[in-house]
């Protein structure tokens, strides 16, 4: 490995038996640099997130929950609009969104050349064909990008009919890179979740795509362990440790009511919800 300190410019060379790439939008370029065959055909489609924010105390105090609506036809699942109570810099606030924005950056502080720099001979066709096979999403994104402040506040009025434009401001939030994956026919398919791409020899794995944070983290890491350490995870020591961390590991909660109740009780207790 060749690791560069972005602040000092210092370059360090390391040797590792296993490498995991969990760099958000930066994972795809790193995966491509690895040169593994399994990375061929993968591309990325960057989408920025925006929110309407209100911090006026008299408005914020009227709402203390998260309320979901329905995603527009063709929109990705994580675009489901919702009105949410948050704490920003110690102050309560209301957020409404998300609204999608187009960018060529893979990270919020990335380069405008991230997208073009990720194009390879092996993923060019999938990346060019993906808009054709995802016209609903393409139309949705174009509509989102060209929305005015008045348009966004008008969407908010489905949740909060008395919303006024002056009380809300638009702020940038996260950045995600949707997976563009090659199909069997050689075209491109846009994926809305996350995916583990792992080297055949188990020395490297990368987490690509976008998801609502911790909701997929545990499952993704279990996938990495099973694919990159297939022999070790079968050992008694690893099996014991896995079941200590995940009591339901390797079992079906659908078919085992007693186990389901036990897991649910453990979860409620751990999260202090009971």
Locate predicted features.
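Core beta-strand elements of the Rossmann-like FAD/NAD(P) dinucleotide-binding domain
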Residues: 7-18
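Acidic, Ser/Thr-rich low-complexity intrinsically disordered segments
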Residues: 247-274
């Amino acid at each position: 490995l060749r690791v560069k300190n972005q602040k000092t410019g210092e370059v360090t060379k390391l040797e590792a038996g296993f490498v995991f790439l969990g760099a958000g939008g930066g994972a795809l370029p790193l995966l491509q640099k690895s040169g593994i065959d399994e990375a061929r055909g993968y591309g990325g489609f960057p989408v920025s997130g925006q929110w309407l924010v209100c911090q006026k105390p008299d408005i914020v105090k009227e709402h203390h929950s998260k309320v979901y609506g329905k995603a527009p036809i063709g929109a990705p699942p994580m675009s489901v609009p919702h009105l949410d109570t948050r704490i920003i810099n110690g102050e309560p606030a209301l957020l409404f969104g998300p609204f999608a924005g187009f960018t060529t950056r893979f990270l919020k502080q990335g380069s405008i050349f991230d997208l073009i720099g990720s194009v390879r001979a092996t993923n060019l066709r999938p990346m060019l064909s993906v808009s054709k096979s995802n016209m609903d999403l393409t139309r949705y994104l174009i509509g989102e990008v060209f929305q005015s402040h008045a348009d966004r506040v008008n969407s908010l009025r489905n949740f909060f009919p008395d919303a006024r434009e002056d009380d809300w401001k638009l702020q940038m939030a996260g950045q995600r890179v949707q997976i563009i994956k090659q199909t069997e026919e050689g075209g491109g398919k846009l994926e809305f979740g996350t995916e583990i791409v792992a080297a055949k020899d188990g020395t490297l794995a990368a987490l690509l795509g976008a998801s609502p944070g911790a909701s997929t983290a545990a499952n993704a890491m279990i996938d990495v362990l099973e694919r990159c350490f297939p022999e070790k995870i079968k050992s008694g020591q690893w099996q014991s440790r896995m079941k200590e961390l995940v009591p339901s590991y390797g079992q079906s909660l659908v078919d085992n009511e007693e186990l389901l109740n036990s897991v649910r009780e453990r979860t409620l207790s751990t999260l202090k919800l009971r």
